[in-house]
Amino acid sequence: MILGDRDLKYYLEKKWILVDPLTEDSVRENGIDMRVGGEIARFKNVDRPFEEGMNPDDFFVRERGNEFVIWPNEHVLMVTEEYLRLPQDIMAFVNMRSSFARLGLLVPPTIVDAGFEGQLTIEVMGSGFPVKIRRGTRFLHLIFAKTLTPVENPYKGKYQGQRGVTIPKFTK
């Protein structure tokens, strides 16, 4: 079952779903919009392939600021301004807001697992021309779905509780 605006407001009021900070215009007809945070990680142009066991920091450049340009065909990691917490019976689908999608920006299919909490780090793929995006701009739309029963194994992975843009983590 997809949660509509009335459902979402109720879940937020009961604190079953947490979105912090929550702005008045964030709750939409069938989801919640998330805003651009103040940090981005750009993929470095390196001449060697990444292999598990290598330090992912060697492949990214982090930037902090209030506006970012996503260059043509560039892939970046962006973080949401909001911290999200989901219960064990709610998951979310992440989509690019249509205004940015119409500019050619893309996000890969992404799911937020039931039980997740943290700021979202999302890959954004650039368009055919540069696009400037400012901190605080609504850029993602989350569609929330209720599972029939609470999940047996809620998310407790390595990205649980993440804050700021989080580059890939590999464990042995």
UniProtKB/Swiss-Prot annotation:
Molecular function in Gene Ontology: dCTP deaminase activity; nucleotide binding
Entries under Pfam families matching the protein: DCD (PF22769)
Pathway(s) this gene product operates in, as recorded in its UniProt entry: Pyrimidine metabolism; dUMP biosynthesis; dUMP from dCTP (dUTP route): step 1/2
Catalytic activity: dCTP + H2O + H(+) = dUTP + NH4(+)
Entry's Gene Ontology BP terms: dUMP biosynthetic process; dUTP biosynthetic process
Keyword set includes Hydrolase: yes
InterPro entries named in the record: dCTP_deaminase, dUTPase-like_sf, dUTPase_trimeric
Keywords: Hydrolase, Nucleotide metabolism, Nucleotide-binding
Enzyme Commission (EC) number: 3.5.4.13
Location of the active site: 123 (proton donor/acceptor)
Top class in the EC scheme: hydrolase
Binding site for dCTP: 97-102, 113, 155, 162
SUPFAM superfamilies: dUTPase-like
NCBIfam families from the UniProt entry: dCTP_deam
Family affiliation: Belongs to the dCTP deaminase family.
Description of how the protein assembles with itself and partners: Homotrimer.
Physiological role: Catalyzes the deamination of dCTP to dUTP.
Protein name: dCTP deaminase
Originating organism: Metallosphaera sedula (strain ATCC 51363 / DSM 5348 / JCM 9185 / NBRC 15509 / TH2)
